[in-house]
Amino acid sequence: MIRIYTQLEQGEAWLRRYSDRLPLFTCILGFTETGLIPGISAAGRTPEDRKYTACADAEFLYYGAEHQPQYPLPPLTAGASPVLISRAVVEAFNMPVYLFNAGLPQSPAIPAIDLGGCPAKCLSTGAAMELTTVEHLFKQGLLWGERLAAEVPEGYVILSECVVGGTTTALAMLTGLGINAAGKVNSSHPVCNHEQKWQLVQQGLEAGKEAGGQGVGCRGDKSPIDPLKLVAAVGDPMQVVVAGMAIAASRGCGVMLAGGTQMLAVYALASAIAETYNLSWQPTAVVVATTRWVAEDSTGGTVELALNIGKNSQYPQIMTPPLLATKLSFANSQYPQLQAYEQGFVKEGVGAGAACIAANLYKNWQQHQLLQAIENQIQRLLDR
């Protein structure tokens, strides 16, 4: 049920080490005004819907299908929110869940830990966040990473995200760090909107340079980059929090970065921050976990992107992380909302792929058990 796409030996060793452990499941919620641009994301049918996607997903993850939500799951162009997958696993194993508000336009209707961040402006401005906010969020990430690791000293933490428009800020982060990512990221669309993303990223990196953002460069620049300034220019609040959490948690437990493009960007960011600020961490304790819909998306290039992280002239010591994916399939699902995943809609989010990998590691769940649990979630939602 698990395929390793890069760093086979390291990935296998990681899976063996944590094969029977129940992880902590965390989701870091953030927002970028990039997500409001028409056509940028399918994680909510309209820009107005997308303002509330993170709140809705968090509420469903925490309370489940029977709860009458303050923020209902938003209508999608096709498919259903990947939180259905994550919730199915979290509920089945009574997995501890921690939710963090890194910067949302409104407070979620759940007991989330507020990290004192704020939503990011559109990355095209080159001034997405104040540097002081980024530094504060990074410190919060370090603090909570250490706390979470202390809860599972022999286990691992799943660090997941919910940020609409987050694959575009991921492209900006990777490009700014000198990694060849153009045309290789994923999206919630069946065919990735590479051109739209790339134009925004070029605009943002250029604007960041013109505004005097020292260390905000485009691929090909040889000067080293201050990664925190790069986040302030073109990032989103989730990225720097999870980078901090991963660095600190890796010192004491395993870390599963739960997502595709977005978590490859976070891994690269964490590596760059650790080098720039001389912070100790254990990159071999970290894996990136996603779905096969991301890893095998023919309109992206996730595996190539993971490999490119290890071919970076600006940060030559950054290694390619192990990229894992669940083999979960919805081809035989009776629900068209789930079959849509096989047509390329949605693909990943809220740690869906990582949750399935965790279920297989912990209790050897296979395709039929996962599908049954997920279909049970969708039926209860329809019955509500």
UniProtKB/Swiss-Prot annotation:
Query: From what organism does this protein derive?
Result: Nostoc sp. (strain PCC 7120 / SAG 25.82 / UTEX 2576)
Annotated GO MF terms: nicotinate-nucleotide-dimethylbenzimidazole phosphoribosyltransferase activity
Domain of life of the source: Bacteria
InterPro entries recorded for this chain? Answer: Nict_dMeBzImd_PRibTrfase, Nict_dMeBzImd_PRibTrfase_arc, Nict_dMeBzImd_PRibTrfase_sf
Task: Provide the protein name.
Answer: UPF0284 protein alr0297
Cross-referenced CDD domains: DMB-PRT_CobT
The record's comment on protein family reads: Belongs to the UPF0284 family.
